[in-house]
């Protein structure tokens, strides 16, 4: 696996859980002997939904809700087979979406 890299993209609604997961991944990769760059914070997506408070009238009374999706990027350069095995065994919280590209 020389001159290869693993790119891991993490997404979550809660940034604290996301940062904990990123630290776990970085720590595991460094322990197995790989070079790690990251976690790199990517721009946060913000989805805003506007809803009328009243059912029939009062259009001026509105409520806004937002959903923020936080993202991080981790690059693992020159991973060893031990690194890949350790990452596969790693348990992360259910609120974190993980996308891995080899």
UniProtKB/Swiss-Prot annotation:
GO terms for molecular function: structural constituent of ribosome; tRNA binding. Keywords: Ribonucleoprotein, Ribosomal protein. Gene3D superfamilies: Ribosomal protein S10 domain. PROSITE patterns: RIBOSOMAL_S10. InterPro entries: Ribosomal_uS10 (IPR001848), Ribosomal_uS10_CS (IPR018268), Ribosomal_uS10_dom (IPR027486), Ribosomal_uS10_dom_sf (IPR036838). One of its GO terms (biological process) is translation. GO terms for cellular component: ribonucleoprotein complex; ribosome. SMART domains: Ribosomal_S10 (SM01403). Part of the 30S ribosomal subunit. Belongs to the universal ribosomal protein uS10 family. Involved in the binding of tRNA to the ribosomes. This is Small ribosomal subunit protein uS10. It comes from Exiguobacterium sibiricum (strain DSM 17290 / CCUG 55495 / CIP 109462 / JCM 13490 / 255-15).
């Amino acid at each position: 696996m020389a001159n290869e890299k693993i790119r891991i993209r993490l997404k979550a609604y809660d940034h604290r859980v996301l940062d904990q997961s990123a630290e776990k991944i970085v720590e595991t990769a460094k322990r197995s002997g790989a070079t790690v760059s990251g976690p790199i914070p990517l721009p946060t997506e913000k989805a805003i939904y506007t809803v009328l408070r009243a059912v029939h009238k009062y259009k001026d009374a509105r409520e806004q809700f937002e959903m923020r999706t936080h993202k991080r990027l981790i690059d693992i350069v020159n991973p060893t087979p031990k690194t890949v095995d350790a990452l596969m065994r790693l348990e992360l919280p259910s609120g974190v979406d993980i996308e891995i590209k080899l």
